[in-house]
Amino acid sequence: MRGLRRGLSRLGPRLGPWAVPRSLRRVLRAAGPWRGQSSAGSVSERGGASMEEVLSRSVPLLPPYETKEKAPPPAERRSAEFVRYYRGLEAGSRRAELLGCLARDFGADHGRVAEFSAKVLQAREQEREQGALLQAEDRVRYYLTPRYRALFQHLGRLEGGLRFLVELRGDLVEGLAAKAVDGPHVKEMSGVLKNMLSEWFSTGFLNLERVTWQSPCEVLQKISDSEAVHPVRNWVDLKRRVGPYRRCYFFSHCAIPGEPLIILHVALTSDISSSIQSIVKDVESLETEDAEKITTAIFYSISLAQQGLQGVELGNHLIKRVVKELQKDLPQIEAFSSLSPIPGFTKWLVGLLSSQTKELGRNELFTESERQEISEITEDSTTETLKKLLTNSEWVKSEKLVKALHSPLMRLCAWYLYGEKHRGYALNPVANFHLQNGAELWRINWMGDTSPRGIAASCGMMVNYRYFLEDTASNSAAYLGTKHIKASEQVLSFVSQFQQNSKL
């Protein structure tokens, strides 16, 4: 393992961002050597087995259907050999090659699938007894199972195996995103492993843990490293985020104790916050909290700490568990809400301005009076000037521009969250997450995030998704079933203004 760490540190600058994924770095720090592996050695390609040999030995053959219940499990040493070999490969191209080979050459037996699919059709046409039809269907299901699934299944039962599978899927996810590994077989394997991890990481196996300043340093460091929404600036900032009027929780797994899987930060306030700076920046540090002042819980950051668990439903369960925990500890809390970023809004808006200018020769997202007011301030009426304005943060330094852009950007943002869809659901991923959970699209906040990052991503706007606990189940069912978005009067008013004033 030390050799692997040294190799990764040397290779990192040369192989680029996929070389040492953040999820892998965390696993390497915490995992230690694999059982049966000395800290100095792993199977390498120099003088060792070839990739094809390792895969052939490690991936068990699918036994005949008739003997599937009697087939012995694969030898533990073969699975351990696979782990050692994988961890000994260069992160990046060589791992991508192995994953591609595993997905392509050790998948389902398509010949058998075709054979027994034909028998299912034959049984239906001949109207044979129900038992024969069900058995034929069962054979199809059996041969649809990819061979690599048995390897994953066995690895999941070994000590340290679940941690390794999360690491491997993290490499798959990051490799697919970087196009380092691609193709339908690889995407299918990533999906198969995701479904297996969803079962292993179901709520019954998860522990809810609260982070305080007295938590182990390793945990505090992981909380800081994993913060993806509002980066932690220093230890003072971190201490504030786990101190009075703040809560930080994470899920861990019984097989990977103490390792954060997904993290939720909560601010305890007297009202529904409209600005993230009031929560994470320049906040007076208090030694104690007055419970009587707390009436509201604000979920202001939720971050997945393990890339390999992407797509596994953890966030909704974490919020529900935290709500129950807060209700038990602080029963006076009346309101639960998020204070969420709006990633992608600026990019969407600039793209829309470009397409309108190209198709219509003019910008019709803003009213004539709004265009006139902005052109008087900028001394330029072209759409290109407006696009440049929105893609840098200089405009927020002008009070006149901030005032002039307030109304058009608020209604455009409302439409982006409420009206822009992907397959019928909200295009914005954060909106889709909270709406699936049953929250209400409640309030859009002008200048809710005045950091450079917030200005660049969403023109400084943030949004509250309210969790009315008595309505979350029905809201979620309506959104998932009929794609209906529950929204407040404020949001619907802005949407109506957009439909009246803007042309798409």
From Swiss-Prot:
Enzyme class: lyase
Span(s) of short sequence motif Microbody targeting signal: 502-504
This protein's pathway: Metabolic intermediate biosynthesis; acetyl-CoA biosynthesis; acetyl-CoA from malonyl-CoA: step 1/1
Residues of the transit peptide: 1-50
UniProt region (Alpha-helical domain), positions on chain: 51-201
Location(s), subcellular: Mitochondrion; Cytoplasm; Peroxisome
Transmembrane helix recorded as keyword: no
Major localization class: mitochondrion
Highest taxon listed in the record's lineage: Eukaryota
A biological-process GO annotation: malonyl-CoA catabolic process
UniProt entry tagged with the keyword Flavoprotein: no
Any one GO CC term of the record: peroxisomal matrix
Record field: catalytic activity: malonyl-CoA + H(+) = acetyl-CoA + CO2
Annotated segments matching region Catalytic domain: 202-504
Site (Essential for catalytic activity): 222
Alphabetized UniProt keyword annotations: Cytoplasm, Decarboxylase, Fatty acid biosynthesis, Fatty acid metabolism, Lipid biosynthesis, Lipid metabolism, Lyase, Mitochondrion, Peroxisome, Transit peptide
One MF annotation (Gene Ontology) recorded for this entry: malonyl-CoA decarboxylase activity
Pfam families assigned: MCD, MCD_N
Active site: 340 (proton acceptor), 434 (proton donor)
Gene3D superfamilies from the UniProt entry: Malonyl-CoA decarboxylase, catalytic domain (3.40.630.150), Malonyl-CoA decarboxylase, oligemerization domain (1.20.140.90)
Transmembrane segments: none
Enzyme Commission number(s): 4.1.1.9
Function text: Catalyzes the conversion of malonyl-CoA to acetyl-CoA. In the fatty acid biosynthesis MCD selectively removes malonyl-CoA and thus assures that methyl-malonyl-CoA is the only chain elongating substrate for fatty acid synthase and that fatty acids with multiple methyl side chains are produced.
Protein name per its UniProtKB record: Malonyl-CoA decarboxylase, mitochondrial
Protein species of origin: Anser anser anser
